[in-house]
Amino acid sequence: MTCYRLAKRRDLFAFPYPIAIWRDPPKSVEIVRNLVADGGFKHIYTVGDVVTRNFLEYGLIPTSAAVDEKTRRGIRVERFSAFRSVVEVVNPPGYITDEAWSAVEKAVEGGVVVKVRGEEDMLSLAFIRLAPPRSIVAYGHYMGALIAIPVDWYRRDLLKLFDFLEKC
């Protein structure tokens, strides 16, 4: 069973790791598109409703995505048809439940939307750990930046964040 709970040092998880793009869409999506092309990346995983919607709207279709249908801006992802399947899971705030972890394991294979009842934020760590080589994980930072993580470049360092999670 794989379940993690954020118990301490929440501040470390709010830090804008490692490429923060402080531009509004479509420019932010264009920057990631260029990063993908220039870096030879093959997979893009988005975490969050606004990021996923922006990628879809501006033609950069994620390999898979995780959404919770709750945003500060009231934006909903409506183009689930861009994906082969939708997997619904329960994942409370500050957790990566076993159910959510299993859904991300399926999602890294491609074509899956993980639709979360609860909160999807922590699933970015699951994507970082499970994504295949040549992947980018993208999510929105609460202060407005688009965060893009080239997994091969940063995985080892970012996985140290698991040291601050408790097994549940």
Swiss-Prot record:
Write down the InterPro entries for this protein, in alphabetical order: GTP-dep_dephospho-CoA_kin
Q: Which organism is it from?
A: Pyrobaculum calidifontis (strain DSM 21063 / JCM 11548 / VA1)
What this protein is called in its record is: GTP-dependent dephospho-CoA kinase
- The EC category is transferase
Q: Which Pfam families match?
A: DUF359
Q: Which reaction does it catalyse?
A: 3'-dephospho-CoA + GTP = GDP + CoA + H(+)
Q: Belongs to which family?
A: Belongs to the GTP-dependent DPCK family.
- Gene Ontology MF: a single term: kinase activity
Q: Which GO terms describe its biological process?
A: coenzyme A biosynthetic process
Question: What biological function has been recorded for the protein in this entry?
Answer: Catalyzes the GTP-dependent phosphorylation of the 3'-hydroxyl group of dephosphocoenzyme A to form coenzyme A (CoA).
Any idea which UniProt keywords this protein has? Answer: Coenzyme A biosynthesis, GTP-binding, Kinase, Nucleotide-binding, Transferase
Give the Enzyme Commission number. 2.7.1.237
Positions bound to GTP: D49, V50, V51, D68, K70, E120
Which pathway does the database say it acts in? Cofactor biosynthesis; coenzyme A biosynthesis
